């Protein structure tokens, strides 16, 4: 035994001496240098010419490092470590200082990185940091980013970073100056290049960073980190490649969480533009990107004209960039655009509309555009533009102008310019009689009916069955009936055995299914066309069928009409046949036949139009017969898939008028050349449009079952609807009411082979819109026979809903069963008890405040996760009992909870602040068999800025436990 102890003592002495020697060794500059070089060669691969200092405070000089095709160099790197933090939960670096950092992006790095660098699925655990790492102060005198196309310099950068779990939190960041310049061209005043020369050189550059190429090689990846930027302020931004060096001041507050970039504040200040913006960018799992930005812009050069606008953009999986810009301050100016990013010539279409756009030329001189319409479409090097507007100058008559032209990267050609003054017309006010006002002051919509609905959800299978739809509506004094049934399954399948829409004597019938494959059959029988279209008379029958799948639809239709008459245009008979089959090869045909047509004073005896086309050949025939005019044309054509050229010829030309006859020889050729498009691209676009349509249908389907996605649940209810809306001419909807009633609602959920059932005998929801105020009342009765037990009563009002949006509401839960919590969690095996609560809502719709007072009695919970919830009150024990799976029970005889929630604003930043006060005198927890712990507790949990404060006590029979935890993070 003594020998054993002797060996142990010698081993302890040996390791103690070794530790002291190793500690003294790394404390010295020489020792730290050897240790750093040894570990660096094995793990990091960083090269440093000079190393000084020790492990607590060291400096690296002339650093070189290559990662992911990016070359990083720096003159020096100085790091200071807080040694006391090594004995705490967080590791703190007091200071990190760099000098002259250069990041060089090599050629083809973007494509190589997208293909090889990241795995298809990234687990969050790879980037999970259990214990926080804090970089307290980071200072860089200069950071230079270079690429084959651009150079960006950041001067005097000051920031801080906190790494915890999957979160990266940036402290308020300051950048003194940002310089942006081109890496290819030097636009100095001494050497100004010709514009055409620049464009030619630009066209010769290889498109290394083509956005379409980069996005097309991407697989679905989720970014596993959440990034929070409290604030970023840039004192000056300078673009040094241009003749006028514009200076900008930029301030930014943003964060990235769950693939959503939330921009809380973006402020740009310059001599020519001042802008405040906020919004968000969503990176979807299918690699599409959605963006919504709201901005307020002030233009000093236009006498501080203030403009509020909203930008909505979407980059979808078909590489189409769709955007919409709306500004109400510019009198409803709208800009809609579509850009195809998967083609080298970038086809696009942009449309601008504005009414009464005004611009201040001088302080008391205004330039107005009464009606402004613009179109820009084509390709980046071959586009067409059209501008039509009416503009006025002060004291001058309005002038109409029409400009059309085309252009490319080098030139702009004007094809047509027309302008002429418009004669002024005097407008007289029309007297509106009271009966006319009453006509427009009626309810535009009245809806009443009943719906039976049942549903079921079992993990990944969901059903909603509506066996009875019985709705009756009155739209602008026109009656509408909706009768039928609907079946919905698993987010991607909708089927109806039949739905009838009755509009007066007109009937629309729908039958079929919509899913991965769809079969939709519809028919229209309209004998009363003027029911919705005044002055339109006649009869019409139609059948339209959609068959196939998402990519290759088959569409067929047959439309027959008789005695159509509208505004001096009369058709005796019309027949339209259509057949389209987009399979591996496109084919389509259409036939239009009409006879005895009266077009004002012109009479047409017969009109016959027929077309047929596929991927390679096309045929078009046109026949018109009348007393004064006879036209017969037959054109055959073919597309060349390789060149994109179309070649056609007239098989027949015969035109006869009262002046004489015009004929031509056969095989008169016509050609169309377009180097930017081919018929193959056209059909690919058609297929992509079908994909977009299918994707739209899928996104429209509601995610109603997401809340119950983990376990089996079903519901059944009978719902009645009564609604009406009133519209005053020239104003918004002024009055309206919606009443919903439900009877015998049954909820059923299966957890761990055990079934939970809850019945709601009756619920009633009424919503009223009276002028600018929205008011609603809610009544939910679990047991209709018990007047005061197991009920929910309340109201929610929004005052001045179009402007101030102030909210006021109150909900009362009276002796409601606590077992309802089983429908929101799967962790509890058994729950019982009752609670009653009063919840008040106030504030505004955008800044709501909540006050909830909850009283509970005889609460019993059985679960194997109770210890996990209890440890939430002790942050240092988090995660220590996660693997304990035993039967645990908690009983609370009586207690109350007070919950408050309100928005918090500080230094122009917004956050949510909430507080929970818990108080119970009799609590017992059964942890192990025959081990019961009894205690009382009074706790207060406060949340603000992602941090928690917990203050209170837990009182046991033998001892008293005081809690005072502040600024901790779950």
Curated annotation (Swiss-Prot):
Q: Which cellular components does GO assign to this protein?
A: plasma membrane; TAM protein secretion complex
Where is this protein primarily located? membrane
Protein localization: Membrane
Q: Which residue spans traverse the membrane?
A: 12-32
Q: How does it sit in the membrane?
A: Single-pass membrane protein
Q: Which GO terms describe its biological process?
A: protein secretion
Record key words, sorted = Membrane, Transmembrane, Transmembrane helix
Q: Which family does it belong to?
A: To E.coli YtfN.
- Annotated protein name in UniProt: Uncharacterized protein BU087
């Amino acid at each position: 035994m003594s020998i054993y102890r002797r060996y142990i003592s010698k081993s302890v002495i040996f390791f103690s001496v070794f530790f002291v020697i190793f500690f003294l060794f790394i404390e010295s500059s020489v020792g730290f240098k050897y240790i750093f070089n040894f570990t660096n060669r094995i793990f990091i691969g960083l090269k440093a010419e000079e190393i000084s200092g020790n492990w607590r405070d060291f400096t690296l000089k002339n650093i070189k490092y290559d990662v992911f095709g990016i070359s990083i160099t720096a003159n020096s790197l100085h790091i200071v470590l807080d040694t006391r933090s090594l004995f705490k939960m967080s590791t703190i670096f007091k200071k990190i200082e760099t000098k002259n950092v250069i990041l060089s992006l090599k050629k083809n790095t973007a494509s190589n990185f997208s293909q090889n660098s990241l795995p298809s699925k990234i687990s969050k655990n790879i980037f999970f940091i259990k214990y926080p790492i804090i970089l307290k102060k980071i200072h860089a005198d200069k950071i230079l980013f270079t690429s084959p196309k651009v150079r960006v310099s950041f001067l005097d950068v000051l920031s801080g970073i906190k790494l915890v779990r999957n979160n990266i939190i940036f402290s308020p960041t300051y950048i003194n100056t940002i310089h942006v310049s081109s890496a290819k061209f030097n636009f100095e005043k001494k050497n100004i290049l010709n514009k055409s020369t620049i464009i030619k050189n630009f066209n010769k550059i290889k498109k290394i960073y083509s956005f379409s190429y980069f996005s097309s090689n991407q697989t679905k990846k989720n970014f596993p980190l959440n990034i929070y930027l409290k604030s970023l302020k840039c004192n000056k931004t300078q673009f040094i490649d241009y003749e006028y060096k514009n200076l900008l001041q930029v301030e930014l507050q943003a964060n990235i969480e769950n693939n959503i970039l939330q921009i809380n504040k973006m402020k740009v200040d310059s001599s020519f533009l001042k802008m405040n913006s906020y919004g968000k960018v969503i990176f979807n799992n299918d690699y599409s990107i959605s963006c919504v930005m709201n901005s307020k812009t002030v233009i000093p050069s236009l006498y501080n004209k203030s403009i509020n606008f909203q930008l909505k953009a979407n980059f979808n999986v078909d590489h189409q960039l769709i955007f919409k810009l709306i500004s109400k301050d510019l009198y409803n100016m709208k800009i809609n655009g579509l850009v195809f990013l998967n083609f080298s010539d970038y086809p696009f279409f942009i449309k601008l509309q504005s009414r009464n756009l005004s611009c201040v030329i001088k302080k008391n001189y205004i330039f107005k555009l009464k009606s402004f319409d613009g179109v820009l479409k084509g390709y980046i090097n071959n586009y067409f533009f059209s501008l039509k507007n009416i503009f006025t100058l002060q004291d001058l008559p309005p002038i109409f102008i029409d400009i059309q032209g085309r252009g490319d990267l080098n030139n702009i050609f004007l094809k047509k310019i027309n302008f002429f003054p418009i004669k002024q017309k005097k407008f007289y006010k029309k007297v509106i009689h009271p009966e006319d006002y009453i006509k427009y002051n009626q309810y535009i919509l009245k809806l009443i009916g009943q719906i039976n609905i049942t549903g079921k959800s079992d993990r990944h299978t969901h059903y909603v069955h509506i066996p009875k739809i019985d709705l009756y509506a009155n739209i602008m004094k026109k009656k509408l009936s909706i009768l039928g049934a609907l079946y919905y399954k698993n987010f991607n399948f909708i089927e109806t055995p039949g739905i009838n829409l009755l509009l007066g004597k007109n009937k629309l019938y729908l039958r079929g299914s919509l899913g991965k494959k769809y079969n939709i059959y519809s028919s229209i029988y309209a004998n009363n066309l003027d029911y919705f279209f005044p002055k339109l008379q006649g009869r019409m029958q139609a059948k339209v069928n959609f068959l196939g799948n998402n990519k290759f639809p088959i569409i067929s239709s047959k439309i027959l009409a008789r005695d159509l008459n509208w505004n001096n245009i009369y058709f005796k008979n019309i027949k339209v046949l259509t057949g389209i089959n987009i399979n591996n090869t496109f084919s389509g045909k259409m036939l239009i036949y009409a006879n005895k047509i009266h077009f004002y004073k012109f009479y047409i005896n017969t009109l016959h139009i027929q077309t047929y086309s596929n991927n390679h050949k096309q045929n078009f025939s046109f026949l018109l017969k009348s007393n004064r005019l006879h036209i017969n044309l037959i054109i055959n054509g073919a597309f060349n898939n390789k060149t994109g050229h179309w070649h056609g010829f007239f098989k027949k030309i015969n035109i006869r008028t009262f002046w004489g006859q015009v004929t031509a020889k056969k095989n008169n050729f016509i050609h169309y050349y377009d180097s930017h498009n081919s018929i193959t691209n056209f059909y690919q676009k058609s297929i992509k449009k079908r994909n977009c349509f299918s994707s739209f249908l899928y996104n429209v389907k509601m995610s109603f079952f997401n809340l119950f996605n983990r376990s089996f649940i079903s519901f059944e209810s009978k719902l009645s609807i009564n609604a009406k809306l009133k519209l005053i001419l020239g104003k918004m909807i002024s009055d309206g009411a919606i009443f919903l009633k439900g009877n015998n609602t049954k909820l059923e959920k299966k957890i761990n082979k055990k079934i939970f059932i809850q019945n709601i005998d009756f619920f009633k929801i009424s919503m009223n819109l009276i002028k600018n105020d929205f008011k609603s009342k809610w009544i939910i009765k679990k047991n209709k026979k018990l007047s005061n037990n197991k009920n929910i009563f309340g109201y929610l009002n929004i005052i001045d809903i179009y402007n101030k949006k102030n909210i006021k509401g109150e909900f009362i839960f009276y002796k409601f069963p606590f077992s309802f919590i089983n429908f929101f969690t799967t962790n509890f095996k058994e729950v019982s008890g009752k609670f009653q609560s009063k919840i008040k809502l106030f504030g505004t719709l955008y800044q709501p405040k909540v006050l909830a007072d909850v009283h509970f009695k005889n609460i019993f919970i059985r679960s194997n996760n109770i210890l996990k919830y209890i440890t939430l009150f002790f942050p240092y024990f988090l995660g220590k009992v996660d693997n304990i799976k035993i039967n645990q029970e908690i009983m609370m005889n009586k207690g109350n909870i007070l919950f408050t929630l309100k928005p918090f604003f500080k230094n122009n930043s917004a956050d949510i602040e909430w507080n929970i006060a818990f108080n119970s005198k009799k609590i017992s927890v059964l942890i192990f068999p025959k081990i019961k712990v009894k205690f009382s507790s009074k706790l207060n949990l406060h949340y603000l800025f992602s941090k928690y404060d917990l203050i209170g006590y837990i009182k046991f029979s033998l001892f008293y436990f005081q809690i005072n935890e502040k600024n901790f993070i779950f």
